[in-house]
A protein has these predicted regions:
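Helix-loop-helix hairpin linking two adjacent transmembrane segments in secondary transporters
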Residues: 163, 172-219
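C-terminal transmembrane helical hairpin of 12-TM major facilitator-type secondary transporters
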Residues: 313-356
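Helix-to-loop junctions at the C-terminal end of transmembrane segments
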Residues: 96-107, 299-311, 394
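Cytoplasmic helix-loop-helix junction between adjacent transmembrane helices
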Residues: 140-176
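Juxtamembrane intracellular "pre-TM" segments in multi-pass secondary transporters
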Residues: 30-38, 220-252
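Helix-breaking motifs and short loop linkers at transmembrane-helix boundaries and internal kinks
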Residues: 75, 107, 128-134, 332-333
Length: 431
């Protein structure tokens, strides 16, 4: 580990400036080093956050393949069954926003550990819930608990990791979310077929507890985080509004909305197309699409390395272009072309999200937790709003309409990424 170079000193200076209001200034003869790529502490932090990403998304999405089982077990309609996921994601969107404020005054390590453990225990509670409304309450609480991880994880990495290794570390975290998103769907489906949906959800809960224990054991303590307790509403409002004045951050928030909105909308409705003629795939065959999430496991760390080498804007533009290519392939009739298109969209999404989320932490010089929370709020709003609206588009215009909707979003995203590249070029010229 080494002391931060010139490019990282503005972040350390901002944190020191914030802390100076609460702590007297003292000489700093031995500045605390950042986690540098290749060191043992760096890999401990990266692997710990991979476990956190896995646990978060496996706990979140484990119910998705079980919606028909819920309909049969509790005698509810498919729309009512889907509340077991939509209520959780809605609560998560709210919670990540609140967590950005709370995390400024509490230990990031403890907050993430508590959130993961509470979510895993609530998942076990879901597996034994005797009534439908109790299951929904537990899933909503789970979404609120999970909100303590995503924004805080992004802020932790931005504060503790050396800038030259931030892309890879963020990529490993996002790769963990990809593994979790796939495992949460695939494991529950397989276990439910072999035993029951209750055992399937309980299994995910137990795996979540084990992942939390591994996370807690591996994650190095924060050295560059300065807790700020007792901050009033006016402070948080000012800090929140300040994020929109930092050049580039609003564009990254927009990209979070575009990336997740496009990705979820495609995954929500491609199944309807494949169930219909001429494909007539079974639910099990369509479920195999979730294995494409493995593309995200590869894309996230790879895009991080590429961003560290070639620049974030170039990788973002390439990721969005790959998503557009994949979307075009889904308009073709051969099933192999559609499958390849879904893989391209998945790879591009995880690569783009990895780069954009890491970039937020680099640009937010103060209140990193709040900046990360704003990004994730936009991210989950994209999932909720565009994903829901896509259903109306599907009903009226079929897959061509859905592809058109996603295509418009990707054009907006490309415009934002090009604008970011222009901002970075002007900053280098001014320097």
């Amino acid at each position: 580990m080494v002391a931060p170079p010139e490019c990282h000193r503005p972040i350390a200076s901002a944190l020191s400036f914030s802390a100076s209001f609460m702590f007297p200034a003292v000489p700093d003869a031995h500045p605390i080093p950042y986690l540098e790529r290749g060191t043992r502490a760096y890999w401990r932090a990266s692997i710990a956050l991979l476990f956190a990403g896995y646990a978060t998304f496996s706990l979140l999405y484990c119910v998705q393949p079980l919606l028909p089982s819920f309909s049969a077990a509790f005698n509810v309609t498919p729309a009512e069954s889907s509340l077991s996921l939509s209520l959780t994601t809605a609560a998560l969107a709210l919670a990540v926003f609140i967590a950005g404020f709370v995390s400024e005054g509490w230990s990031r390590h403890k907050l993430m550990t508590l959130s993961l453990m509470a979510s895993a225990l609530l998942t076990i509670g879901v597996s034994i819930a005797p009534q439908w409304h109790q299951l929904l309450v537990l899933r909503t609480l789970e979404g609120l608990a999970l909100g303590g991880v995503p924004a805080v994880a992004m802020a932790y990495l931005a504060e503790e990791v050396h800038p030259e290794g931030l892309g890879l570390a963020m990529g490993l975290y996002v790769g963990g979310t990809a593994i979790g998103g796939m495992a949460g769907r695939v494991i529950t489906g397989v276990v439910a077929d072999l035993f029951s949906w209750r055992i399937a959800i309980g299994t995910i809960g137990v795996l979540g507890i084990l992942s939390t224990l591994a996370f807690r054991a591996l994650l190095p303590p924060s050295h560059h985080f300065v807790p700020r307790r007792g901050l009033g509403f006016n402070h948080h409002r000012t800090a929140l509004l300040k994020q929109f004045t930092r050049p580039g951050l609003p564009l990254l928030f927009l990209l979070g909305f575009v990336l997740m909105g496009s990705f979820v909308t495609l995954y929500n409705y491609i199944g309807y197309r494949l169930l219909a003629p001429p494909y007539r795939l079974s639910q099990a065959e369509i479920g195999a699409i979730f294995v494409v999430y493995l593309a995200g496991v590869i894309a996230s760390p790879l895009s991080g390395r590429m961003a560290d080498t070639f620049g974030r804007a170039r990788v973002l533009i390439g990721s969005l272009a790959l998503m557009a290519l994949g979307l075009a392939l889904t308009l073709l009739h051969p099933l192999t072309a559609i499958a390849l298109g879904i893989a391209c969209v998945t790879f591009g999404f995880f690569a783009g999200h990895s780069v954009a989320s890491g970039w937020v932490g680099r640009l937010a010089r103060e209140a990193k937790g709040q900046a990360a929370a704003l990004y994730l709020l936009a991210y989950y709003l994209g999932s909720s709003l565009v994903g829901s609206y896509g259903g109306h588009v599907w009903a009226g215009y079929g897959w061509n309409g859905v592809a058109g909707l996603v295509g418009v979003l990707l054009v907006i995203g490309l415009a934002a990424a090009l604008r970011l590249r222009g901002l970075r070029a002007r900053e280098r010229t001014a320097a």
